[in-house]
From Swiss-Prot:
GO terms for biological process: carbohydrate metabolic process. One of its GO terms (molecular function) is magnesium ion binding. Belongs to the XFP family. Its cofactor is thiamine diphosphate. This is Probable phosphoketolase. Keywords: Lyase, Thiamine pyrophosphate.
Length: 822
């Protein structure tokens, strides 16, 4: 290690490599005596753990052999591609070291979140020192052989990623994309009263939008019910190539900012290891005492006022303990330490010599015996069993998840005597069922919404709970509750992040959002799906409860809000992910929505996206019919078909997916039955979009033979779809009759208008569907030309009516499904 610039780093050994300029190796240091809570022995022990973790971290980045430096480093000992990020690692290892101290002293149940997740070598090193790595990966024992394997696998083909990942013991936070650490930490703490989450936030990460809003997470943490989060802002001043904003504003301004977010920040700063150890130990003690005081007061019946939670601002150098100077450029304490401080260690003799000196500066001979095992004094520093942060079962939430108690959805269904004979708001019906789900599961189920719970018609949930709210309550506020089971905040990032943290630590939840604005969390969905994908391949990870979206206020019923609110493209984003992970459902009415959501809340390790309407909509299927239809995922609606010669191939297939497309398809089918009674029409409704894929492409996919039986091999298919038309083509391009498939859907035509004008703008309306049938069924262009002209005229009249009256024409607005005369 280096003494840092103030300690005379330039007195270290110099090496001049082929790259030119001086390269300065770090040297071992003596611990400075400083005031603090640590006695000499404890200070030395903590520093030994920190040195060991740093040594193991550097080894992971550079070495593929000779882990204990039993011989001078040679080129073949160095990896040919040096990948990783050392800059943040010493800070992560430092926090882990001191977290272990308070865990042991206080018997804490704690987990660790590495916001600068690209510092993956640090948590890997600590998990190996704690023994968890070897317990989970028997081929990586806690000795020299295991150390060599730990080093060799890092950022290496067939190995482990450079950042915290599902493969990392003790991690439930993916470290690839920055910004979500604090939200995951708060989500983990919800309903976990005994849990402490040590959350390290990178100062670069703190510049991201999601992290910037994450500080408000403490407004939803009830100290009487929930655990605690200790945010630690790692202020090492630099990102990849630039300084960080938080490091370059005056400290009083930073403190005022953090206090404004509801924290009591404690600053720990320095570049002398002995001094920093003492300061950080003192800060940890203060924070743990304050957290215990807050929780004790709340659980003893205090007035419930929102506390100011403690946090730590840790200001230490970027790449602390790495070579101070490389090829004449300052590295330690600068942006140059972000990734690999010695980039030419394999090919440059000077870099390689300095790498060896760097590794030896940690004095590994004091830390590991001659067989590479951590010395007993080091092992004694780790907590025991599940108290080890790398072994805490909370970080493997699938091992803790329990089935929800779910009421029978059939008891909440609506009566359907005849198809289309009644109307209901589908999501309002679902809200009644979710009310009971909430009541039956008061400790492991939460609903999240960005101020849209009532707008999406789920307000019945508030009959049994309130909105979680720890801030001030005004005279006219309603349904706010310190222990509420609904979290509403106008930030999709907060909703998604808290829910992810809640799910990753073994619980269940629902996120309801306007369809167009769920795009705000596209990237968060993407990262969570990747976590599910990767964790499914890790044998010791257990399946999590699914991430369940309920998207409403959707594209076809945002006619009043206009173009900005009209976007069904989240479905396209979701279906880019692996079929083993994602599911998309488009229930056409209230009963199918109930059946679908019952299935989703029972499922494991998926992302379920359900799109449903909140406006009054026709009820098509009874409870019994809905159960069968949803189990199939798609099927022929015989009552809507028309074929005077049963057993013959239909002349045309009308397919639909989504509530509004279903309505328009059935209206088109009624017109065809009335006006072209000899035309054989088959109506197919699709609830589970994955059924359109081939069986070999998705677990829900239909075999080709079944698909051809339903959709035929030659008849035209007119498919009315909720989203962008090309998505259906993506799903069906390998099917026999794909050339006969014509899809209508949203084609980015929108404005503030009426519901029917919206579908007309996108050629999804009943009249245009009839025109599509006439255009594509052989012979109809000639024989049904008059009907086609009527459809053109009907569209014109409908649009003219909206321009004159500001509402849809009654023949459309008052339409109901006609009972067949036969």
């Amino acid at each position: 290690m280096t003494q840092m610039a103030s300690a005379g780093g330039d007195t270290s050994a110099d090496n001049v490599g082929a790259h030119g300029g001086r390269t300065v190796a770090p040297v071992p240091y003596e611990l400075t005596e400083a005031a603090g809570p640590l006695d000499r022995a404890e200070l030395a022990a903590l520093d030994a753990w920190w040195r060991a973790a740093n040594y193991l971290s550097v080894g992971q980045i550079y070495l593929m052999a000779n882990p204990l430096l039993t011989e001078p480093l040679r080129p073949e000992h160095i990896k040919p591609r040096l990948l990783g990020h050392f800059g943040t690692v010493p800070g992560l290892n430092l926090v882990w070291t001191h977290a272990n101290r308070v865990i042991r002293q206080r018997g804490l149940d704690a987990v660790f979140v590495a916001g600068p997740g690209h510092g993956g070598p640090g948590p890997n090193a600590c998990a190996w020192l704690e023994g968890t790595y070897s317990e989970l990966y028997s081929h990586i024992p806690r000795d020299g052989e295991g150390m060599a394997a730990l080093f060799a696998q890092f950022s290496f083909p067939g190995g482990v990623p450079s950042h915290c990942a599902p493969e990392t013991p003790g991690s439930f936070h993916e470290g690839g994309e920055l910004g979500y650490s604090l939200l995951h930490a708060y989500g983990a703490a919800l309903d976990n009263p005994d849990l402490t989450v040590f959350c390290v936030i990178g100062d670069g990460e703190a510049e991201t939008g999601p992290l910037a809003t994450s500080w408000h997470g403490n407004k939803f943490l009830n100290p009487g019910r929930d655990g605690a989060v200790l945010p630690i802002l790692a202020l090492n001043e630099y990102k990849i190539a630039n300084p960080t904003l938080f490091a370059r504003i005056p400290e009083p301004e930073l403190i005022n900012l953090l206090e404004g977010y509801g924290h009591e920040p404690i600053v720990v700063a320095g570049d002398d290891p002995g001094v920093v150890h003492q300061r950080l130990a003192a800060a940890m003690d203060t924070c743990m005492n304050r957290i215990a005081q807050i929780q004790r007061a709340a659980r003893d019946g205090a007035d419930g006022s929102r506390p100011a939670w403690p946090m730590i601002v840790l200001r230490t150098p970027k790449g602390w303990t790495c070579p101070p100077v490389v090829d004449g450029d300052r590295v330690e304490g600068t942006f140059r330490a972000h990734q690999v401080p010695l980039p030419a260690a394999r090919t440059d003799d000077g870099h390689r010599a300095v790498l060896e000196q760097w590794l030896r500066s940690y004095r590994p001979e004091e830390l590991f015996d001659d067989r590479g095992r951590p010395v007993p004094e080091l092992l004694a520093l780790a907590p025991e069993g599940d108290r080890r942060m790398s072994a805490n079962p909370v970080a493997n939430g699938g091992a803790l998840v329990r089935d929800l108690r779910l009421p029978d959805w059939r008891e909440f269904g609506v009566e359907v005597k005849t198809p289309g004979g009644s109307t209901h708001e589908a999501t309002r019906v679902l809200g009644g069922w979710l009310r009971e789900v909430t009541r039956l599961n008061p400790h492991n189920f939460l609903t999240f919404a960005p101020d849209e719970l009532a707008s999406n018609r789920l307000q019945d949930i508030l009959e049994v709970t309130g909105r979680d709210w720890q801030a001030e309550v005004g005279e006219y506020d309603v349904a706010l509750d310190r222990s509420g089971r609904v979290i509403e905040v106008l930030s999709e990032h907060i909703c998604q992040g808290l829910l992810e943290g809640y799910l990753l630590t073994g619980r269940h939840g629902v996120f309801t959002c306007y369809e167009a604005f769920i795009h705000i969390v596209d990237a968060m969905f993407n990262q969570h799906a990747k976590w599910l994908d990767a964790s499914a391949a890790v044998p010791w990870r257990r399946p999590l409860a699914s991430l369940n979206y309920l998207l409403s206020s959707h594209v076809w019923r945002q006619d009043h809000n206009g173009f900005t609110h009209q976007d069904p493209g989240f479905l396209d984003v979701v279906l880019n992910k692996k079929p083993e992970i994602v599911r998309v459902y488009l229930p056409p009415d209230a009963n199918t929505l109930l059946s679908t959501y019952d299935h989703c809340l029972r499922s494991r390790h998926y992302v379920n996206v359900v799109v449903a309407g909140k406006q009054p909509q026709e009820d098509w299927l009874s409870v019994e019919q809905a159960a069968v239809h949803c189990a199939r995922g798609l099927g022929i609606w015989e009552w809507a078909c028309h074929n005077d010669d049963p057993g013959t191939t239909p002349d045309v297939v009308l397919a639909c997916a989504g509530d509004v497309p279903t309505l328009e398809t059935l209206a088109a089918a009624a017109i065809l039955r009335d006006r072209l009674p000899r035309l054989r029409v088959r109506v197919i409704n699709v609830v589970d979009l994955m059924r359109l894929l081939p069986a070999e492409e998705h677990p829900h996919g239909l075999p080709d033979r079944e698909f051809d039986t339903l959709f035929t091999t030659a008849s035209p298919i007119i498919f009315a779809f909720h989203g962008y038309p090309w998505l259906i083509h993506r799903l069906t391009y390998r099917r026999t009759n794909h050339d006969g498939l014509h899809v209508r859907g949203y084609k980015e035509e929108g404005t503030t208008t009426t519901p029917f004008d919206m579908v007309m703008l996108n050629d999804l309306d009943r009249y245009h569907l009839v025109m599509d049938v006439i255009d594509r069924v052989p012979g109809l262009r000639e024989t049904a030309a008059g009907l086609r002209q009527e459809m053109v005229d009907a569209r014109w009249r409908a649009r003219a009516w909206t321009r004159e009256h500001g509402a849809d024409i009654p023949v459309v607005a008052d339409w109901t499904w006609p009972e067949p005369s036969r």
